[in-house]
Amino acid sequence: MFHRLNIISSVVSSTLRSWHGSAGSKSVKQPPQPPILFDNENSPECRLVREALTELNLDVLIYPCPEGADRFAAQLQQYGGSNTSVPFLVDPNSHVKLEGAEAINAHLFQQYKQSSIPKHIDTNTLNLFTSRLASIVRLRGAIRAKPSREPQKPLILYSFESSPYSRPVRERLCELQLPYHLINLGKQQFADMGPASFRFHLGEYHPVPNTKRAKLLAEKGRVQVPFLIDPNQSIELLESKDILDYLNKIYAM
């Protein structure tokens, strides 16, 4: 029952943001090195950055920094100074370090799409307000750090920002300060719409060729988020509840 209510409130959270962070570009090429994002899942500004990452279909390495976090605090201060706050982006491909959603999103769209920030994810008053509402609906999820065992290697999470099923997983990763490679699988065509078990199309599902979705289907036989890979335990998991149970069992203290 709790998990069902958790997903319902996650749906409301995505609805408050008009489901931005669902669609993804078909053409963005992944850079040689993934950008690093110091992130708090519940931060209104961080949400706008993650929406931009989904729209660009850009993969990043996430260093979670919830309130009271200490695991990546030294690295964050080393990059940005003692008063640096999230979101904070380090892009090794262009040798830039940026703080705040406005500066980060401007860089991401200019660097990886040669365009300006779309209005619906700009840091205007309306977007920040609806992003705050989306956080409130989640009952301040992922706002406080929880004790955890640190993995030797970052985990891998296939997700897209507005996914109601992926959000609780990202929140738990954030609470436990578990670093992870975020593989964004934004929806690129009408056939991608809807949950994996009931897509809004007729016939066999075919992703856009030569994309991450096509590669995932070829390798795993299914395109579904959240999809977690833990290279430390040689584990692959679908279904948000199973992933949450796994994270609690292996990493929570």
Write out the residue ranges for each language-model feature.
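GST-like domain detector, emphasizing the conserved glutathione-binding G-site
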Residues: 1-253
